Amino acid sequence: MSLKIPEHVAIIMDGNGRWARKRGLPRIAGHYKGAEVAEDIVEFAIELGIKHLTLFAFSTENWNRPKGEVEALFELLRRYLQTKKDKLYKLGIRVRFIGRRDRINKELVKLMQEIEEESKKFKNLFLNLAVDYGGRDDILRAVKKAVKLQREEITEELFSSLLDLSCSPDPDLLIRTAGEKRISNFLLWNLAYTELYFSETLWPDFSREEFLKALEDFSRRKRKFGRVLDE
């Protein structure tokens, strides 16, 4: 079977806390291990020829976690971006952040904006990092923009352009790890015709081999988009 490479893959990186708990480690240790896995999957995506990759890093609901864990997660993100940005540039990755920014530390927002600006010329991979992102919040913010327009102007295409992920095509494949079978308020508008793949593997144990399993499963599917296909 030949492998069909999707143009856009989105991933819900779930299971960091459970991975740490199984090993008697603090939850943040799972997140640090998960960041290492994310880095490897990003590199593998480039090798495979995937053009767009969206990673769910922090949701609007994650603010409900203990304050110490939230602070540690944002410190992990800041440290990762600061230490890895040059590697991202060297790999030719354009980085974009989707989600709200009004609740994030101003220094981190400044770093995010700097990376977006410095990487905008790269085209090997479009990497979307969802930070303080929620699908309902995304749609609500788009509606607030749309109400300023004439009703006749608003089309499905125009509304899509008001969403956070407007610079990337809708995902072809969504992967969620750790066995949960739900999309958890992620890219609600954009996942209309996305193929869903659920892996039992906890994110810190997710490997290139596991990623290939998802792509092999995707390659066997017939995407109809509402049409009737010949069997």
Swiss-Prot record:
EC number(s) given by UniProt: 2.5.1.-
* Active-site residues, Swiss-Prot/TrEMBL: 14, 62
As cofactor, the record names: Mg(2+)
Pfam assignment, any one? Prenyltransf
Q: What are its GO biological-process terms?
A: polyprenol biosynthetic process
Q: Looking at the record's lineage, which domain of life comes first?
A: Bacteria
What CDD domains does this protein map onto? Cis_IPPS (cd00475)
Complex formation: Homodimer.
Q: What is this protein called?
A: Isoprenyl transferase
Organism whose genome encodes this protein: Aquifex pyrophilus
Give the gene name. uppS
